[in-house]
Structures are given as C-alpha cells and as structure tokens.
Amino acid sequence: QMPKDELILLIQSSFRNYRPKPARREYIEKSNGKKRPLGIPTVLDRIIQECVRIIIEPICEARFYPQSYGFRPYRAQKHAIRGIINVINAGCKSPDQPVWAVEGDIKGCFDNINHRLLLQKLWRIGIHDKRVLKIISQMLKAGYMENDLFHVTELGTPQGGILSPLLSNVYLNDFDWYVGRMYMEPHRQCKHKGNDTRRLKWAGVTPKYNYRYADDWVILTSTEKEALRLKRVLTKYFRNRMKLELSQEKTYVTNLRTNGIHFLGFVVKAERKRKTPDPATWTNHLVGKPLPDMERLGKKIKKLLEEVHRIELCQKVNVQAAQIQYVNSVIMG
C-alpha cells in the first residue's frame, strides 16, 4: 500500500502530463444471453477519473433535467417509477390523462457516443477548464487491450469506467430538455411554472411527460396520435442531433390501459382502483399501478436457485463459503 503523501504527489504529477493507459476489455453476460463489454482501467486511471468526477459532477448536476434518475446522487429507480405513477394519478379526473407511452430503446447508446459532440456538450453545460476537457478527451481515446492487441476507440465511453455514467448523462441531457421544453419544463414566461404548463394546455398543446434512467426512457402522453408523432420526431432527433439510432423494433407506443410499459423491472399500467367496502370512497377513475415484471423476475429467481443449489455440491468449506457470499451479494444487489 502506497503512503498517502506519495500517492498525492503521484496524482499531481500525472495531472501535469496525463497519458491514460488502455483499459482491459472484459465481457459480462447479460440477461438476454448476449455479452456486454467492460473496460477496466488501471488503478491510477481510476483515481484520476474519480478526481475529475468530483470536480465536474456538481456543475453538471445543476444543469441536469429534474426527471433524469440514472447514476445521480440521491436518486434511484423507485423515484422514477413513483414519478410516473404520480403523473398518471394526477390526471385521473382529466380527459388529458397520460395513458399512452413511448418506450425508447437506443441502439448501443454507450458504445456510440460521439466524442466531439460530448466535449461540446460539456462546454455548454459549464465545464470551461480546457485542462479538464483535455484529460476527458484523452480518457475517451485511450483505447483498450483485448487478447494482447490494442484497439482504438473512436466512439463511445468505456463501460466500467468511473466517469462514464456521468458523461452519458451529460450526452443525453439535451434530449431530456428537448422533450421537457415541449410541456413539462417550458420556457418561463410566468412567475410560477404551473401557470406556464397551464398556458400551454390552454393553447392546445398535448401534455407529455418524460422520465429517463440511464439509456432507458419513457414519455407519457394522452393520445395515440401524439405518441406516434413523438416517435417519428425523436427518431429524426436522435439521428441528426445526437448521432444515435433508435431501435424501431424495441421502441414501442403502448396503451397503458391494456398492455402497460416495461420500465426498470416493473410493468406500469393504468387500471381502475380496486373496489372498497364503502361505495362512497370508490371511483371509476384510472390510476397507475406498478407491478413486478414477472418474466424478468422469474429468470433471475431461476438463476439464483441454481446458484443456491451449487452450495450443496461444494465439497470444500472455503469454496462453500465463497459461494454463500456470492449468493448473498446477488440477493443484496
């Protein structure tokens, strides 16, 4: 273990003439059987990435969209689901209740991020120190090693790096605000934001509410026509403005009253409230209901049971203890 003072000197000297080393490429299995590439940087590179993250994260957080929940402090999946449910419930007595949704899927989002566009977005969001931008640019172009061969990275942020989640949020932040300005977070003309959204509603603008977690996003609106229009508009927006592609096979327009949306391990539907013993408290309005995605959950339970069964097959005590520790880590997440 390196002494603290010596480590600080090493980091300071590295910042003066920083040259990141190529990351080590590894693959982890996804739930659908495919493999996701991970870039594992060196220990020194990880420390420097964490230093950069500490510097730029507060600046970025001040400009991030309020309904973006992935890889952000004090935000989690449950907050995104709760926001969707609140929006559905708030419009339960309105003819404009958001019961149609666009579920978005970006093809290889993290692997296709344009480096030049990302640096421009960092500048616009408030990162004006050119030394920091230079370090980030070098990190993005450091490349990776696979089977003892060096590969150049022209696109994407390395999944597995400490800074990558923050950079992906910076890249997709313009998309958040592009949709948000349509209705949910309009340009302020009134003293209170509620008056601005009311002004848009009176002008005939169809309500739309967007929620994003990492590269998964959902937009709620009140009509099928508006949902189909948004899908067409956003397909062009991602292609022309973000240099990314929406998967047309996996980008759905969904009626929450019949199918529900699959988002962050839940199936969110708009259904009637369950009848209560007191008829006076029961209404016929639709409310949002988050239900566990049983198909996805069933696969994970089956895999977990297989790992539990392996504990019984372990002959050595230390191997059995390691397997128990692994199973506990999976359960705890």
PLM-predicted stretches and their roles:
Residues 1-333:
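Non-catalytic terminal/accessory segments
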